[in-house]
Amino acid sequence: MAATVNLELDPIFLKALGFLHSKSKDSAEKLKTLLDESLARGIDASYRPAQKDVEPPKISSTKSLSIKQEPKTSSSLPSGSSNGKVLAAEKLKKEAEKRPADKMKDATEGVDVPKKPRLEKPETRSSPITVQTSKDLAMADLSSFEETSADDFAMEMGLACVVCRQMTVASGNQLVECQECHNLYHQDCHKPQVTDKEVNDPRLVWYCARCTRQMKRMAQKTQKPPQKPAPTVVSVAPTVKDPLVKKPETKLKQETTFLAFKRTEVKPSTVISGNSSSNNVSSSVTSGLTGWAAFAAKTSSAGPSTAKLNSTAQNSSGKPAASSASQKPVGLTGLATSSKGGIGSKIGSSNSTSPSVPLKPLPPLTLGKTGLSRSVSCDNVSKVGLPSPSSLVPGGSSQLSGNGNSATAGPTGSITSKTTSETSSSTSASLKGPTSQESQLNAMKRLQMVKKKAAQKKLKK
């Protein structure tokens, strides 16, 4: 077993062990020199693989082992006492075992090569020339590396010109930094040459040609996108939204017209129940349904403020006062004149909404309804501007001068004279105290609330 172990060991390793365990003062230095020599040999062998004279040390290793077994055994006795030395020896063993493995590979390749004497091999390997060549190679590599690394470092740090890769600076050829990409350019290297004014002006922010192009493209792109979606928003959105927006408006208009007709039917019942609303309305009465629709819409849209005006307009004696021309009230004579159609009239009226009547043959209806309004008119107060029959001229237009309100009477003068005479006779009986004004206001408020609720319900539907 000892023989097999000895065959695997390297003579250099045995030398190193001898130096390690020796008590001489020079042993450390000798060990160091041996290490340097072995390293030099390893480098030399890697550079010159043609010299395949590795087998002689393999043969001579058996001889050297037999010679050096005695000092090894003698030196191994004191090694047991020092643990630190053993640890160091193990390290050296590991290093040395790696080297012989490489040498064994070379030995298998170079068996046929002619053998050289053992003494020449360590001399050639440990020659100082090989050490010098390795140093020269290392120095050359370092110098080239330093040169390249300096250039690369300058480029990485952005200290050199991007075009010519140099850091030289002259008076008219200074390095200028782009504020966008932070690359350095010589004034001459940059394609549109940079002027001294641009370099020396501290207020100027300089951009290279590439960055200026990119910034222009970006600016154009940012300008274009809002223009492109803008027409789509304008064209698409209204097409979707317009029918939705416009349809409810048209519906609302239709509903208001229909509501107007419905309100005309509702109002006579409110008049009969005593909840009369005082409304002053300006109307150009025409023949047919359109006149009635316009009349009813305007009566329904009049506010309670007109009622207050009419109620305050009467005198303390109970005589009705003249209504202002701007209010242009409509009264019972309007119903009579509207039956014949074609004569627009501005007429004095009572405050009651009795003229709003279901659509039927008008002249007989007006007579019947005037009687109805006369019977119910006890609840109504402050009838303003009722015309008197005394100044009525049949067939011609005349002023009903009872209270200064003008009324144009058509060919049906006899009917209007009858209705006005009946209503004027009823005014004296219908005038009451101020408490009825409050009831009128309350009735107005109720009516408006009812109208609003009805309109809201129809809108929801």
Curated annotation (Swiss-Prot):
One of its GO terms (biological process) is snRNA 3'-end processing. Keywords: Isopeptide bond, Metal-binding, Nucleus, Phosphoprotein, Ubl conjugation, Zinc, Zinc-finger. The keyword Nucleotide-binding does not apply. It is found in: Nucleus. Residues 88-124 have a biased composition (Basic and acidic residues). There is a cross-link at residues 68, 253 (Glycyl lysine isopeptide (Lys-Gly) (interchain with G-Cter in SUMO2)). Transmembrane segments: none annotated. It comes from the Eukaryota. Residues 45-129, 300-371, 387-444 are annotated as: Disordered. The keyword Phosphoprotein applies. Residues 346-357, 387-436 have a biased composition (Low complexity). GO terms for cellular component: INTAC complex; integrator complex; nucleus. Dephosphorylated at Ser-127 by the PNUTS-PP1 complex, promoting RNA polymerase II transcription pause-release. CDD domains: PHD_Int12. Pfam families: PHD (PF00628). Residues 300-327 have a biased composition (Polar residues). The modification Phosphoserine is found at residue 127. A zinc finger (PHD-type) spans 158-214. PANTHER family: INTEGRATOR COMPLEX SUBUNIT 12, NUCLEAR FACTOR-RELATED. Component of the Integrator complex, composed of core subunits INTS1, INTS2, INTS3, INTS4, INTS5, INTS6, INTS7, INTS8, INTS9/RC74, INTS10, INTS11/CPSF3L, INTS12, INTS13, INTS14 and INTS15. The core complex associates with protein phosphatase 2A subunits PPP2CA and PPP2R1A, to form the Integrator-PP2A (INTAC) complex. Belongs to the Integrator subunit 12 family. This is Integrator complex subunit 12. It comes from Rattus norvegicus.
